[in-house]
Amino acid sequence: FQMLHSEIMTIMQERQKVNILIFDNCGFGCINNLEMNHGIGSLATEFRYTDGKKPTGDLIPVDYAKIGEGYGLKTYTCHTIEELVNALEDAKKQDKACLFDLKVLPKTMTDGYESWWDVGIATTSEKESVRKACEGVLKGREEARVY
């Protein structure tokens, strides 16, 4: 969502009834998973305050519902399943786009995805974890279908 939310303007221009669900895990969780699985650690994919040099402080809270309000959407912030169920029921009654700011725990993404993603990785590194991840990437490339 933070990478590109200009689609909301198009939704509003066209008066479309769209439900937008944002799973707020305090970062780019999918990219963080890729980094961690490739042995390189997090490269600022968690939204944290810095100590002046590195983002190692507390997580930065973002109120995505307020961003949606700024665009004129009906918004909901949900911390529990019950809040989400109630918000979904209310959203059915709305005649405009709705945004759901779903507060989830960091690092609670679905693992695996039952697929393979060819992500570039260093072929030489001082870190054993990167060298091992590189072996996995090279093996995956050998097994990948050519289209």
Residue ranges: model-predicted function:
Residues 1-147:
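Thiamine diphosphate
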